[in-house]
Amino acid sequence: NAEIYTGQARWDDCIAACDELAKGGFALDKKWNDTFRADNDKRSTEIIWSIVYDEVYAKGMGWYQRWLHYAHQTGWDLQSGPWNGLVTQPTFYDSFADNDLRKVEGFLIGKQYPRKVDENGNYYYDTTAEPLKGSEEYNGQDLVFVNYIKSMTEGEENSGARSIKYEIQPGTTGDMNNDWVMFRYSEVIYNKAEALMRKNGGKATQEVVDMINSVRQRSFKAEDWEKAKYTTATLTMDEFLAEKGREFAFEGIRRTDLVRFNKFVTT
């Protein structure tokens, strides 16, 4: 954001810094959510800088408490009760393609069921079991998250999609093991791509398209990729900003991006 605050663009410096970081041995994780697993300190090749958390030795990571409903405590075998607090803005949730794995796997929407773990350690929702139940406006009724918020002051207990971007382990306490991701290699790719676009009059070259697609591709199944990938015609500056919002949702960098794109105070 050098140009915003000093009046002097430093896109060449940005590109040079990104090129230096690319020499550091970092690599994109194979799956979009490997970066946010409970063992991301060991699993991820993408994380450059993170805040260390541990349920015993470095407490404070309470992602699920902020997003999940009270009923998830028993339904998901959690030792500490969620607060039913944060929800996703409906327009943002709708901005994801329906076959985008960041949407399919990264949010809770619809009827809520107990979550189980199979013999291979994979999570699944037990739709043969009794659905989780509401306890406020929908007391005793099936808990069904809807992509709708009545108002900022009168949200109902089932309002909004809930983010599960960070893995929530069964039996976890209110202090999760996931390290909080501050900066990852995919952001380096995005930063260089944006700098190249801005030096090219805001238009994407094939190099830029390939860079963004290298991050985006893991969020789609192979059979869906041909229609999902960007081209030099579809990757506009506005679409770049929108896709960066989806890729880095809830990671704390959106304000900086909106300021740089002169959209922080626009609707």
Summary of predicted features, one role per range:
Residues 25-28, 220-221:
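Helix-capping and short linker residues that terminate individual alpha-solenoid repeat units
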Residues 225-236:
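Short, mixed-charge amphipathic alpha-helical segments
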Residues 8, 59-63, 107, 226-227, ...:
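Short, solvent-exposed loop/turn and secondary-structure capping segments
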Residues 225-226, 255-259:
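A glycine-biased, small/acidic residue-tolerant capping/turn segment at secondary-structure junctions
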Residues 27-189, 198, 264-267:
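Elongated scaffold/linker segments in the mid-to-C-terminal portions of large proteins
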Residues 1-22, 49, 100, 179-217, ...:
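Extended, hydrophobic/aromatic-rich amphipathic alpha-helical segments that build helical scaffolds
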Residues 11-12, 82-86, 92-93, 205, ...:
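Generic detection of long, well-ordered alpha-helical segments
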